Amino acid sequence: MNIYDQLQAVEDRYEELGELLSDPDVVSDTKRFMELSREEANTRETVTAYREYKQVIQTISDAEEMIKDASGDPELEEMAKEELKESKAAKEEYEEKLKILLLPKDPNDDKNIILEIRGAAGGDEAALFAGDLLTMYQKYAETQGWRFEVMESSVNGVGGIKEVVAMVSGQSVYSKLKYESGAHRVQRVPVTESQGRVHTSTATVLVMPEVEEVEYDIDQKDLRVDIYHASGAGGQNVNKVATAVRMVHIPTGIKVEMQEERTQQKNRDKAMKIIRARVADHFAQIAQDEQDAERKSTVGTGDRSERIRTYNFPQNRVTDHRIGLTLQKLDIILSGKMDEVIDALVMYDQTKKLESLNN
């Protein structure tokens, strides 16, 4: 099936979905209605672009016909030639756009995410930088209209982040933040550095799609759940009732501790969300490691320890090592204006996937 047959099939299905979504039997079936609504939303951009493309093709045909009929009318002929030139350029742009829109979709792209940030190499400075990254993602989420909820956090003595786990919810969160997993390196002069020397520290970021219970069911026999008293600063118990939850997935050893909420049930629910995402991600990563060829055609190697980006404060520079992108906009990017970096990563990934399909 060539690209035009594929596009026509997508348009035919889109029209069929429109009819199905107005069918009373479908409307009364909430689950099916939601599934079909999601499918319609996912194909809408492709169908809109395809219809605009067909209009451009018609405009080209009309302009060519006008040029034939414009003999003796130089002004009309010139106008038709200009329209033909513009329409042919638009045709090429639409063809590239449609190729990208037809690329296989990542099934996780529309999902919310679990975001984990940890200070790594560099002690206090690494923890402070982890805090900077947390602020950057929080502000970026605001620009996108997403909800950002810190689920679990651990700070050090200087106010840095030892570890933070957050849920980011909204439209297409995973599609934009999935490229953030990896090691983020910072180069700057620490506040405690009296000689003015630049130090290098690292924080790690992990982005996992939220996993619903219906998508990945963990056998309760594989979980060990401990209930204990939440502790505050200095280690003192802050609750008379045991509300904190420690959850361990026995087969993998993955552990989650949750004490942010005031009730045991809320802590249990949040811990379950995180452990479900981590366990699903653990097995997905094993499967991904077995697909080296596919991984080479996407952004980076997929290695969670891979250094993906450097933030150089003295030079106000951010470098993404996977795509060779360097921007002298560190202050802007850390303030949450990440679109230029993320758009470049998305475009690079799409280009590589197109090349892979064409080979």
Curated annotation (Swiss-Prot):
Cross-referenced InterPro entries: PCRF, Pep_chain_release_fac_I, Pep_chain_release_fac_I_sf, Prokaryotic/Mito_RF, RF-1
Full protein name: Peptide chain release factor 1
Entry's family note: Belongs to the prokaryotic/mitochondrial release factor family.
Record gene name: prfA
Molecular function GO labels: translation release factor activity, codon specific
Organism per entry: Streptococcus pyogenes serotype M18 (strain MGAS8232)
Keywords: Cytoplasm, Methylation, Protein biosynthesis
Alphabetical list of Pfam families matching this protein: PCRF (PF03462), RF-1 (PF00472)
Annotated GO CC locations: cytoplasm
UniProt cross-references to PROSITE patterns, sorted A to Z: RF_PROK_I
Function: Peptide chain release factor 1 directs the termination of translation in response to the peptide chain termination codons UAG and UAA.
Annotated compartments: Cytoplasm
Protein's UniProt keywords contain Kinase: no
